[in-house]
A protein has these predicted regions:
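N-terminal secretory signal peptides that target proteins for export/translocation
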Residues: 1-15
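C-terminal segment of classical bacterial N-terminal signal peptides
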Residues: 29-36
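Short alpha-helical segments used as structural interaction elements across diverse proteins
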Residues: 13-15, 33, 138-139
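Generic secretory/membrane-interface signal
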Residues: 2-3, 29, 75, 177
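Sec-dependent N-terminal signal peptides
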Residues: 18-24
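A structural boundary/capping signal
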Residues: 36-225
């Protein structure tokens, strides 16, 4: 009787093991493909999207007088909601929108210095009459992108020194794939470290304050000087 009972017990354990293995296979067939599909979906959403480095800011610094003057005249353009994200999640749709706005503004606005336009050395404004200096291009891009749903906190007006050693303004869009530059000098949206510029300062998190960028020179620019 003990021997017969032992045989039955062994068979019972074997059956339970086979049943557990079967359940594991069924679970894998139900869950595995879904997980793989989700992972594949995430890869497809970011496939072909560029990535670059983040450009960190340093201590607070004084905003440009022309920026403060612009904000006094266009308060809604400088308003910043602390609840908004300071970084954009980059998707193909968002990337396409950023590039389309950059190209559109570059093609639409005609260059005109502030001195010729306003009789002033430096004035920041929206180019409502179709003419503008570098900063005016970027302010319009910023406005258009905000209207398309990008948070203003993730779009920073930025002051650089260009390859002619002159002051220049660009728009930096901060994303989860790095910081990208919109520029009236090119239709290509580049990572900040792919430009030839020296980065001086940019808007801070709250719109009113600015932060120093420490005169950072991208490796690309250093190699070409």
């Amino acid at each position: 009787m003990r021997q017969a009972f032992g045989v039955d017990h062994t068979r019972s354990s074997s059956v339970r093991l086979r049943f557990a293995a079967l359940l594991a296979l069924v679970a894998a067939s139900l869950i595995g493909p879904g997980s793989r599909s989700e992972a594949k979906g995430r890869e497809q959403k970011t496939a072909g999207l560029p990535s670059t480095d983040e450009l960190p800011g340093f201590q607070q610094t004084t905003p440009l007088w022309a920026w403060a003057d612009f904000c006094n005249r266009h308060r809604s353009e400088c308003a910043s909601d602390a609840a908004d994200p300071s970084v954009v999640r980059l998707t193909k749709a968002t990337w396409d929108t950023i590039n389309a706005v950059n190209r559109h503004v570059n093609a639409t606005i005609k260059p005109l210095s502030d001195q010729d336009h306003w009789g002033m050395v430096d004035r920041w404004d929206l180019p409502e009459d179709g003419y503008g200096d570098c900063e005016d291009y970027q302010l319009l891009k910023r406005k258009m992108l905000a209207e398309k749903g990008l948070p203003r906190r993730a779009m920073r007006m930025t002051v650089v020194i260009d390859d002619k050693r002159e002051g220049h303004a660009v728009l930096m869009v901060r994303t989860d794939r790095g910081d990208f530059i919109l520029d009236n000098k090119t239709n290509f949206v580049l990572g900040w470290n792919q430009t030839s510029y020296t980065f001086v300062k940019r808007e801070g998190d709250d719109g009113a304050s600015w932060v120093s960028l420490g005169g950072v020179i991208p490796p690309f620019a250093t190699a070409n000087r």
